[in-house]
Amino acid sequence: LLVKELFEVQRYPDLRESPGGAPDLPYDVTGWTLPLQMGVEVAPVTEPLSADVRRKARIIERVAPPAGSVDGAGTVFVFDNRANAAVRAVNRILKAGGSVSVANKELTVGSARFAPGSFVAGGISQDRAQALAGELGIKMTATKAVSDPVVPLKLPRVGVYSSWMASIDEGWTNWVLEQFEFVYTVLHNAEIQAGHLRESYDVLVFPDQNTSAIMEGHKVGTIPGEFVGGIGESGLANLKEFVRAGGTLLALGN
């Protein structure tokens, strides 16, 4: 039964308070269909396996990720952006002093074709590229140069807002950033209220939290003074100025 729950589609019931009324929305996760989450095709077996199939079947002792590789020769390395590990590769290359750009349009490198948005890296050795590809399980194609237009990337200066009111989403947000090897700074109300945010940050991330928790926080008298309040109107004005100055504001859950 657990396998069916994890591998088949869950269908949330059409619950309504009254006929024709608004649907009763779920408060939390509504599905956990692993094939949809992981992009894996699953075929149910509805009858016993034949003797021939059982004879050819083998036990999988361990699951190994796809092997990474670097094909071709050159000092420029092109790789697909769709693999999660590609983001880790980008951060590692930039931290090591290499360069990474994003392709504006489809690239053709030898016999390999790369969709728009693919990464183009340089400033690293063939050995370093091989090590990255092998460790992260990504496939790179080496070439001497890429003539098509690309947009250079840089390591973003990331700030993550932390309310004094507990936020589960903040913990998950920090965890995701750490898994993908982004460096970030935790910002509390005082830092947001101090302003001049664009001087220190390129991206501000606000984890999913209700408006009152962010704007007002804990009320006076309910908690020690240093943990009272939210970003307030002055903090909101500073966020608007940050965006006007070219900063990127990510409001998760909006």
Residue ranges and their predicted role:
Residues L1-N254:
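Intrinsic-disorder/low-complexity accessory segments
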